[in-house]
């Protein structure tokens, strides 16, 4: 009998739960259509579930006065939010409060005279939104995705460093350490979300203790990809999937212990589907042997 262990911290975080709840509640209160500006969270299956309820992801082409638009959990630049309100749309801000804290941090550092380094993925919606707030408070800064990106920061005497909320803690520390070697004054505001840290620590603990590790989450989810990379370093038999349909029977041949973790945008119902499918695969292999 296979032992399936779900990581202590896995799946929906506070910010994602809040965004999904706001989307569901908006359906009861809206007179017009309900949209999200882009996918509300990075999980295609949950986005599709909300779409079936009547919450449609959009880039804004079909918005009409009186419609409801929900700002995604990752946030958007302030100028975009202002443009939505000017169109006569009802705007519901589902930006994660922890992401809002990053917006406040970059403006605080700007007011204090620091050049801002944002450790994150350059094309991630959260980073794009945060850069919008940095512009709005007349700040200057760069995004650091790899250590090769820090060059511009080293030209400044005072550097303030923040992180995308779902950033890898080890890489964040590495960037801080490298910049501190070369810059006269460094101020660090650790804006990595506690939920991200807990999920990463849970994976570090579980991955070495199992034969196979399954990481569930959207392929476009930065925090899920980081869980996968962390797990893969500790357990080569790590696989990143979105749904139970992607599970391959050969992954589980001769396996006794399977670990499961999931990104912050992965709902419980998908985790349960994956767990059930693994049980079916392993029981089928026992019968055939």
Swiss-Prot record:
GO terms for cellular component: cytosol. The active site is at residue 126. Gene3D superfamilies: 3.40.50.11270, 4-hydroxy-3-methylbut-2-enyl diphosphate reductase, catalytic domain. GO terms for molecular function: 4 iron, 4 sulfur cluster binding; 4-hydroxy-3-methylbut-2-enyl diphosphate reductase activity; metal ion binding. Highly sensitive to dioxygen. It catalyses: isopentenyl diphosphate + 2 oxidized [2Fe-2S]-[ferredoxin] + H2O = (2E)-4-hydroxy-3-methylbut-2-enyl diphosphate + 2 reduced [2Fe-2S]-[ferredoxin] + 2 H(+); dimethylallyl diphosphate + 2 oxidized [2Fe-2S]-[ferredoxin] + H2O = (2E)-4-hydroxy-3-methylbut-2-enyl diphosphate + 2 reduced [2Fe-2S]-[ferredoxin] + 2 H(+). Pathway: Isoprenoid biosynthesis; dimethylallyl diphosphate biosynthesis; dimethylallyl diphosphate from (2E)-4-hydroxy-3-methylbutenyl diphosphate: step 1/1; Isoprenoid biosynthesis; isopentenyl diphosphate biosynthesis via DXP pathway; isopentenyl diphosphate from 1-deoxy-D-xylulose 5-phosphate: step 6/6. It is an enzyme of class 1 (oxidoreductase). [4Fe-4S] cluster binds at residues 13, 96, 193. The keyword Oxidoreductase applies. One of its GO terms (biological process) is dimethylallyl diphosphate biosynthetic process. Keywords: 4Fe-4S, Iron, Iron-sulfur, Isoprene biosynthesis, Metal-binding, Oxidoreductase. Optimum temperature is 60 degrees Celsius. Dimethylallyl diphosphate binds at residues 42, 74, 124, 221, 223, 265. Its cofactor is [4Fe-4S] cluster. Its EC number is 1.17.7.4. Catalyzes the conversion of 1-hydroxy-2-methyl-2-(E)-butenyl 4-diphosphate (HMBPP) into a mixture of isopentenyl diphosphate (IPP) and dimethylallyl diphosphate (DMAPP). Acts in the terminal step of the DOXP/MEP pathway for isoprenoid precursor biosynthesis. HAMAP family: IspH. Belongs to the IspH family. This is 4-hydroxy-3-methylbut-2-enyl diphosphate reductase. It comes from Aquifex aeolicus (strain VF5). The lineage of its organism: Bacteria, Pseudomonadati, Aquificota, Aquificia, Aquificales. The gene is ispH.
């Amino acid at each position: 009998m296979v032992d399936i262990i779900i990581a202590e911290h896995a799946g929906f975080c506070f910010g994602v739960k809040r965004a999904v709840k706001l989307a569901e509640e908006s359906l009861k209160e809206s007179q017009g259509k309900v949209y999200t500006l882009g996918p509300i969270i990075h999980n295609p299956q949950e986005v599709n579930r909300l779409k079936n309820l009547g919450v449609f992801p959009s880039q804004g082409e079909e918005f009409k006065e009186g419609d409801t638009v929900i700002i995604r959990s990752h946030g958007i630049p302030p100028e975009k939010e202002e443009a939505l309100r000017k169109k006569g749309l009802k705007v519901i801000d589902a930006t994660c409060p922890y992401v809002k804290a990053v917006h406040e941090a970059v403006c605080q550092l700007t007011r204090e005279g620091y050049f801002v380094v944002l450790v994150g993925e350059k094309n991630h919606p959260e980073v794009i939104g945060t850069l919008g707030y940095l512009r709005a408070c007349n700040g200057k800064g760069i995004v650091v995705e790899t250590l090769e990106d820090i060059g511009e920061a080293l030209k400044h005497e005072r550097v303030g460093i923040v992180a995308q909320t779902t950033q890898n803690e080890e890489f964040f520390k590495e960037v801080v350490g490298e910049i501190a070697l070369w810059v006269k004054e460094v101020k660090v505001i650790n804006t990595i979300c506690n939920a991200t840290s807990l999920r990463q620590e849970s994976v570090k603990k579980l991955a070495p203790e199992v034969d196979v590790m399954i990481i569930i989450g959207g392929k476009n989810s930065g925090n899920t990809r980081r869980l996968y990379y962390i797990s893969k370093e500790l357990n080569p038999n790590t696989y990143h999937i979105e749904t139970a349909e992607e599970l391959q029977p050969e992954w589980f041949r001769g396996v006794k212990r399977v670990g499961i973790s999931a990104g912050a945008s992965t709902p419980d119902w998908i985790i349960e589907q994956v767990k059930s499918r693994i049980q079916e695969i392993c029981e089928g292999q026992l019968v055939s042997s």
